[in-house]
């Protein structure tokens, strides 16, 4: 009898832990926008050089759950990203897996409205699958600061 009760409790704990773990690592669009607002405040307070150093840090201040801040210049060159392989690359004309030139959309949006949302498809590093993503971007001087969330 006790073995069945203990087994039942262990199964319940495992199920609860699994459900919690699945939702824990997923950021929302609202959280992504808030990260951009915080990143812009950091940029204004500490300057571009220090801000980009912080954006580039794996597990730095601007990485949380599956969210991370990244930044382009006004020509689509990646200036800040936790993946060092992307830094310095001009990605303006590089499409997503469905052919959308989303970085062009980001630059156009920043130049026309200053801030807003861009949607596209991107490789989710947590699931290793191409997934729909929505990214909030805001222009500050010569930088476009962005953070995106994967959509369910």
What are these language model-derived features?
Residues 2-9, 14, 19-152:
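N-terminal membrane-sensor/transducer module of prokaryotic signaling receptors
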């Amino acid at each position: 009898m006790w073995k069945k009760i203990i087994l039942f409790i262990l199964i319940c704990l495992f199920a609860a832990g699994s459900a919690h773990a699945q939702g824990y690592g997923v950021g929302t669009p609202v959280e992504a926008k808030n990260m951009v607002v915080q990143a812009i405040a950091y940029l204004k307070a500490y300057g571009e050089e220090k801000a980009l150093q912080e954006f580039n840090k794996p597990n730095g201040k601007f990485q949380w759950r599956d969210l991370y801040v990244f930044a382009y210049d006004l020509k689509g060159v990646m200036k800040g990203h936790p993946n060092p392989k992307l830094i310095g690359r001009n990605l303006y004309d590089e499409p997503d897996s469905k052919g959308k030139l989303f970085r062009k959309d980001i630059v156009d949006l920043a130049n026309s409205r200053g801030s807003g949302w861009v949607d596209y498809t991107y490789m989710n590093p947590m699931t290793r699958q191409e997934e729909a993503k929505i990214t909030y971007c805001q222009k500050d001087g010569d930088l476009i600061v962005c953070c995106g969330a994967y959509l369910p």
